[in-house]
Amino acid sequence: MREGHWDTTHQGVDGQHRLLAIVESGVTVRMNVTFNAAKSQHIDSGNIRSMANRVQMSDYDMSWTNNTILSTANLIGRVFAGSNLSHEEALSEWLMKYRTQIESATKCIKKATLLGLNSAGTTAAIIVAAMNDVPAIHIEKFMDVFYSGFTNNEAELYAITLRDELLRENRVKRGTNYARFAFFRTANRLNQYYKTATGQRVAKRVNNGDFPYNVYDANGGIVKPETKKAG
């Protein structure tokens, strides 16, 4: 490539990675350029771009995002419609506003060998918890116990309870239904763990539809309570 042997192919530079590679090579390359192309479509095929693809092309630096983060944001947007995350610009602004919390929380996510423990719902819950100022050290400890299945104290039993619940429900729920269940149940069990670990009072029972945290939109506003419904 540095010697100028670069094939742009029929796709031209319809991909930021191609353009970046050309720029970094320092070699002049002849190519066709399309002006005023719709960002919502692929230039070469005309096919509609995915939301994830459009977000990556936004005016913000989204190089830090990945499929896990974007699928999690999509789930939050569907469950809490007032967050307006189904719209590209609002989603991009939301991701940037809460980048610190999102990156901190997703560092605790691992690829589990037990499929029931891999859910966008669990990721969504710990991101929202981080947005509600649950300390990273407590989220990390909760998730460590959740993945390992080993506990050392009473508070950590809530992580084991969640683990058992998700493995059980994964046998009867699928897709969005399971993700919504994992979202709400993880949030509740994490809240119980955190409050118990810090000596606060917390209800032992979790009712369907209960959600212990606020969900915020890109402007920092709290999503209206009527959108807080479990699927």
Where are these regions (language model features)?
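Short alpha-helix boundary/capping and kink motifs at helix termini
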Residues: 1-36
